[in-house]
Amino acid sequence: MKKILILGAGIYQVPLIKTAKRLGIYTIVSSIYGNYPGFELADKVYYENTVDYRKILSIARHEQVDGIVTAGTDVAVITIGKVCDALGLKGLSFEAAEIATDKLLMKMQYEKHGVRSAKFRKIFFDDPDYKNIISDLTLPVMFKSVDSSGSRGIVKVTSPEGFDSARRVVLENTRSDYFIVEEFIEGEEFGAQAFVQEGKLEFILPHGDYVFKGDTGVPVGHFAPFDLSAESLADAREQLTGAVRAMNLNNCAINADFIIRDGKTYVLELGGRSGATCLAELVSIFYGFDYYEQIIRVATGEHVDFDSLIKDEASGVANASMLLMSDKDGVIVSQEDLNEPDPDIVEVQFDYKPGDKVHAFRVGPHRIGHVITKGESLDEAVDLLHKALDKIHITVE
């Protein structure tokens, strides 16, 4: 029996755990202790921090695992790279993991290899002259933590008066002594899910994003297909391929963020794992195969024939998703789903139960559930999504 080590036991790792179990793989989960749903599903649990790569490597060696993987978070990616290198497992290398989890290293690689991206500067927090260093950047600019995932530690600044407060926000969301400031590219943001296997980019699936406007944009849902011209799609593929090579990503899922301006695609950043916020499900529904299964198969040493799985990229199944959120801190008093059974309502999930504490939505981890729908067309999927959301009632007091 094969063994797999899954890093994390939260909402985004649960589908990995369930899929590995379905495939008959002995499933080991490691995470810090907490109220995480993946613990009760695993064959074996280690209550260890997934960033402690020495302990995780010791576990992987002791258990003689055939693969190591995570989903929906960058936190454990460095550890995966370390373990894959040390044990010769199939997955991204430590070098690639370092680049994928440090926005400065990523931007430097893009610049070195000619990947189209925003102009940037590296800034040390203790540099009193930092405003002069970024004076040649065109406003507005983005202040970014180099080591936080999602939207945390990212602030858009429209005038020099906002520099100091933005720097404080970044400082509160980083373990590093430096950050980056980059020019804000005005355009249409979109994302893509992709997979690279043995040096080959197996697919790229562009998707649109629903964004919550807080201190910065926070993705709260996605949809596919995303309307790109043939020329723009070819350009996005070219830039993504260049970014993958620049970062030396291999044998891993890819979560990509882009922005398109004047028909040209700019790479914002890439992650060496599948996306959060129902993005793995988006891939599964669109192409008609279980994406979590393919991620696990590759991680445990198999070669997946994506060409046989993806018959026709142009005829994918339209789908859309949205997080469930609270507009205030409090305790869930009640929650109900009044939707009638419908094969096109793929999933309604509540992350918590009545009596649990939740937060007003500001960042991705504040989610309290999600809804996923599909349809004959994107309009049908989106229309059904909003109708389904209207029939879900959650009371927080």
Predicted features by range, described:
Residues 158-159, 194, 324-328, 371-376:
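Short beta-strand-to-loop capping motifs
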Residues 273-294:
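ATP-dependent carboxylate-activation loops
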Residues 55, 129-130, 163-164, 329-335, ...:
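Short, conserved charged micro-motifs
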Residues 324-354:
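Glycine-rich active-site loop/lid that clamps phosphate-bearing ligands
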Residues 170-178, 183-226, 234-267, 271-279, ...:
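Phosphate-binding core of ATP-grasp and ATP-grasp-like enzymes
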Residues 155, 183, 228, 284, ...:
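Short, well-ordered beta-strand elements within core beta-sheets of diverse protein domains
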Residues 1-95, 301-304, 309-317, 326, ...:
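ATP-binding N-terminal substructure of ATP-dependent carboxylate-amine bond-forming enzymes
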Residues 99-180, 186, 198, 226-242:
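Active-site nucleotide/adenylate-binding loops and adjacent lid/helix of ATP-dependent enzymes
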